[in-house]
Amino acid sequence: MSLADELLADLEEAAEEEEENLIDEDDLETIEEVDEEMQVDLNAESVKSIAKLSDSKLFSEILLKIEGYIQKQPKASEVMGPVEAAPEYKVIVDANNLTVEIENELNIIHKFIRDKYSKRFPELESLVPNALDYIRTVKELGNNLDKCKNNENLQQILTNATIMVVSVTASTTQGQQLTDEELERIEEACDMALELNQSKHRIYEYVESRMSFIAPNLSIIVGASTAAKIMGIAGGLTNLSKMPACNVMLLGAQRKTLTGFSSTSVLPHTGYIYHSEIVQSLPSDLHRKAARLVSAKCTLASRVDSFHENPEGKIGYDLKEEIERKFDKWQEPPPVKQVKPLPAPLDGQRKKRGGRRYRKMKERLGLTEIRKQANRMSFGEIEEDAYQEDLGFSLGHLGKSGSGRIRQAQVNEATKARISKTLQRTLQKQSVVYGGKSTVRDRSSGTASSVAFTPLQGLEIVNPQAAEKKVAEANQKYFSSMAEFLKVKSEKSGTMTQ
C-alpha cells in the first residue's frame, strides 16, 4: 500500500468516527421546526379567520374521546401485547400532538392580540413578556387603564412589583382609545386563548393519568407529562425503545425561535428531557450532563415498558434512585484537603565543632606558624619574586629578612595540661629521696652531655659535670682532710709564724 492510500484510509476512518458522533438525518426530523415569523393577517376582522384549531373537527373529536376514556378507568391486566395495538393509545398519541398544535395556536393568538392592543397600551408588551399573562392582563384592563390600581383580579395574574410598574406606565402612555369593534375582537381572541389553554391542561391531565398503565417505569423517571411528549414525538413506545439515548435526548428540540423573542436563551440540542423537572432541579452547569444520564435511563425504562415486563414500576424506581444518587454525588462539595504532617527531617552526620578530639584534630591539621608567615603579605610592599625570577609560590613574610628571632609558640592556658597539687608534692618527694642531688651524689649520669651552639666554635659537646669537678679541685686545697699548715715568713721581723 502506498503512502497516499494509507492517508486516504486514515481520513476514511476519521470520517466514520465523526459520523458516529453526529445525528442521523432521519433523527433530525424529530426536531421541531418553528417558523421564524408568524404569518398573521393584521387586517383580519376576527381571530377565527387566522386561528382555526378550536373550530376544527379533529379538535372536537379528540376532546370527546378523552371525555369518554376518562369515565372508564383501565386495569393493568387489560394492557396486553404491544402498546400501539390498544385503541386508547392512539388517542393518547393524538392528544400529545394536539397539545403542540395548541401551543402554536396560542402564539398566533398572542401576536394578534399584541398587535391590536398596542394601539391602546404599546408599553404593555415589554412589561409583561409571558403570553398567557399578557392575554389575561389585556382582558382585565380592556379600554380602561385605571383598573391597574387596586385590582384584586390583576393581583392573581401579575406580581405586585409588575402591577406597580404597569400602573405608572399606564398613566403616562401615549396610546389611543379603542373602538367598540376593536375591543370586541380583542376580547374574543382572549376568550379563545384561555379556552385553548384550559383544553391543553385537560389533555395533560388525561395523558398523565394513562401513562401509569402504558409506560409506568418511564413515567416514574421523567414524569407522566414528559413521558407522553417524548412517546408522541418518537411515534410510539416501540419506536422509542429502539432509539439510542443520544437521540432520545433531542426529542422535542426546536431549531429556531419565535419572532420577538431573544435567541440567547435558546439552547441547541435540548429537548423535553432537558426541560423536565428532574433535570431543571439541578444547577444550570449540570443540566446537560443530567440530561444525558436521564435520557440513557429513559431508554432502558422504555424497553422494559414495551414488553410489559414490570407493570408495577419497580425498575423505574430503581433507575430513578440511581439517578438521584449520581445527582447527589455530583453536587457533593470537594473533599477537605487533608493536612499532612511534615516529614521527619533526615538527620545526617552533624559537624562536631567542639570537644577534646576535635581540638586535637584541629591542632594536628591546623596551619603552622611557618605556613601562616608564608601566606601573609604586606600591603604596598613589593615581593621578592614579583618579576617571576623564582618558580613556585611566594614565600610572603617568610622569605623576608627580619630580626632573626623565632617567636615562641603561644601556650593556650585554657588547653594547657595541668597536674594536681597532690601529684606535685608526690613528685617533689620522689626527686628528693630517690633522685635528689646532694654533695655526695648527683642524679645525672656520668655519660650525660649537652649540645651547645656558640658563635666561635660552632658545635660543642659539653660535659655537664666538668664545672663541678673544677669546683671540687679548688675546694681540696683548703678544705681537704690531708691539708697541712702553711708557714708564713715576715720580711720585717724575719720571724716565722705558724
UniProtKB/Swiss-Prot annotation:
Acidic residues compositional bias, start-end: 7-24
Motif (Nuclear localization signal (NLS)): 350-363
Keyword rRNA-binding appears in the UniProt entry: no
Keyword Coiled coil: yes
Residues spanning the signal sequence: none
Region (Disordered) location: 1-24, 333-356
GO molecular function annotations of the record: U4atac snRNA binding
One Pfam family cited in the UniProt record for this chain: Prp31_C
Recorded coiled-coil stretches: 84-119, 180-214
Site residues, Interaction with U4 snRNA and U4atac snRNA: H269, R292, K297
Site positions per UniProt: Interaction with U4 snRNA: C246
Subcellular location: Nucleus; Nucleus speckle; Nucleus, Cajal body
Alphabetical UniProt keywords: Coiled coil, mRNA processing, mRNA splicing, Nucleus, Ribonucleoprotein, RNA-binding, Spliceosome
Location of the Nop domain: 214-332
Gene Ontology CC entries for this record: Cajal body; MLL1 complex; nuclear speck; nucleus; precatalytic spliceosome; spliceosomal tri-snRNP complex; U2-type precatalytic spliceosome; U4 snRNP
Assigned protein family: Belongs to the PRP31 family.
PANTHER family attached to this UniProt entry: PRE-MRNA SPLICING FACTOR PRP31 (PTHR13904), U4_U6 SMALL NUCLEAR RIBONUCLEOPROTEIN PRP31 (PTHR13904:SF0)
Free-text note regarding domains: Interacts with the snRNP via the Nop domain. The coiled coil domain is formed by two non-contiguous helices.
Function: Involved in pre-mRNA splicing as component of the spliceosome. Required for the assembly of the U4/U5/U6 tri-snRNP complex, one of the building blocks of the spliceosome.
Subunit structure of this chain's protein: Identified in the spliceosome B complex. Component of the U4/U6-U5 tri-snRNP complex. Component of some MLL1/MLL complex.
Protein's name according to its UniProt entry: U4/U6 small nuclear ribonucleoprotein Prp31
Organism classification: Eukaryota, Metazoa, Chordata, Craniata, Vertebrata
Designated gene of the protein: prpf31
